[in-house]
């Protein structure tokens, strides 16, 4: 089959580095992917052309961070415009999907909330979580934690711009010269290294977002919240646990980058030449459905990692903590069953659809108004 007709995702995103979540995301994912875990931003690497100078990079999530989009190599005004417009696009997509994201986080972490006495009884499902949250906290509470999630985009993009050239030179394998597996391993390594480097700086924002989103009004504690806002999360966590409290779950998050990245791009490169043939090659719907299927599949496969890292985050400030990600994994499976690792996965799938739909519409609006598309963070 003619390789020029079916370029790999890395060829399409030539010159771009890949950073991680939530995890997240995002994954686009959106974004640890998948993050969400990495679901939200993953679709955009299929939907957005690179002729406009915008690539895609894995960022934790939210989901795990999902996926964030990096401006191409440019300086001055061009970079600033792409940077700011990408921020607007990220704010639009993240804010639109924020209610689903909060429900996902509440369902995913409800067992830790019950242990801490901050949730009276388990949620029965997505609709029950929506209804109880609105009833107990009000409609605006569905956006709790969204500010930290939107703010996270900007340092992520700046770090992406700073790290991408270094890791591009360090892991500069060519598929034609070095072979597929060496090229694939190099891309996994570069994505993991760049993702971990970026994550080191923005992880505390994802931590703050997670704690705020899971800060339901506690029935057993007089309806009081644990945190009064993002700054309060930092102050209370540092006071009780020190800086390390802001980075609980960091190691497993870095593993999640590589796992999601390998699944996503491995599936993409394998399925694209088989599925997108003939008339489907330029079909928006076909690309959308393929991207959605791949991000959902990779996101579900890596979702337990996102659950473990977020459950570890939830123990900062608590008397009993997990000693490691392996202990967290084994205790969750032993005490709650393996299905507990997938709590909130249904909401994560809905978030992927909502985020992708909003971004597709926003891309069209940008083309009409500004004559070009700008990238966004999907995580």
Curated annotation (Swiss-Prot):
Solcar repeat copies, ranges: 77-170, 182-274, 282-368
Residues holding ADP: 152, 164, 309
GO BP: mitochondrial ADP transmembrane transport; mitochondrial ATP transmembrane transport; purine nucleotide transport
Catalytic activity: ADP(in) + ATP(out) = ADP(out) + ATP(in)
Regulation: The matrix-open state (m-state) is inhibited by the membrane-permeable bongkrekic acid (BKA). The cytoplasmic-open state (c-state) is inhibited by the membrane-impermeable toxic inhibitor carboxyatractyloside (CATR).
Main location: mitochondrion
Protein name: ADP,ATP carrier protein 3, mitochondrial
Source organism of this protein record: Arabidopsis thaliana
Gene: AAC3
């Amino acid at each position: 089959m003619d390789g020029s007709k079916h370029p790999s995702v890395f060829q399409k995103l030539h010159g771009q580095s890949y950073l991680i979540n939530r995890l997240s995301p995002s994954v686009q994912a959106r974004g640890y992917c998948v993050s969400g875990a990495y679901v939200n931003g993953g679709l955009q690497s299929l939907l957005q052309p690179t002729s406009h100078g915008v690539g895609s990079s894995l960022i934790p999530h939210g989901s795990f961070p999902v996926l964030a989009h990096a401006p191409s190599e440019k300086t001055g005004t061009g970079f600033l415009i792409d940077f700011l417009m990408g921020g607007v696009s990220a704010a639009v997509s993240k804010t639109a999907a924020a209610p689903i994201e909060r429900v996902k986080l509440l369902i995913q972490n409800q067992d830790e909330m019950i242990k801490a006495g901050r949730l009276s009884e388990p949620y029965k499902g997505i609709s029950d979580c929506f209804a109880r949250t609105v009833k107990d906290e009000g409609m605006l509470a569905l956006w709790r934690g969204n500010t930290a999630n939107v703010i996270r985009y900007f340092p992520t993009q700046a770090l992406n711009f700073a790290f991408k050239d270094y890791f591009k030179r360090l892991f500069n394998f060519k598929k034609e010269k070095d072979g597929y597996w060496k090229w694939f391993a190099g891309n996994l390594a570069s994505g993991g290294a760049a993702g971990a480097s970026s994550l080191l700086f923005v992880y505390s924002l994802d931590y703050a977002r997670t704690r705020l989103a899971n800060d339901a009004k506690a029935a057993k504690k007089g309806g009081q919240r644990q945190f009064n806002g993002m700054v309060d999360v930092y102050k209370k966590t540092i006071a009780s646990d020190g800086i390390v409290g802001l980075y609980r779950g960091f190691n497993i998050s870095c593993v999640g980058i590589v796992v999601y990245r390998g699944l996503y791009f491995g599936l993409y490169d394998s399925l694209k030449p088989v599925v997108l043939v003939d008339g489907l090659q330029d079909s928006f719907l076909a690309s959308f459905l393929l991207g959605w299927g791949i991000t959902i599949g990779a996101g579900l496969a890596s979702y337990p990692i996102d659950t473990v890292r977020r459950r570890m985050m939830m123990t900062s400030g608590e008397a009993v903590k997990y000693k490691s990600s392996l202990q967290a994994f084994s205790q969750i499976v032993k005490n709650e069953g393996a299905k507990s690792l997938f709590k909130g996965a249904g909401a994560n799938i809905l978030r992927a659809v909502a985020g992708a739909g909003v971004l597709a519409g926003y891309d069209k609006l940008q083309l009409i108004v500004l004559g070009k598309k700008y990238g966004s963070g999907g995580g």
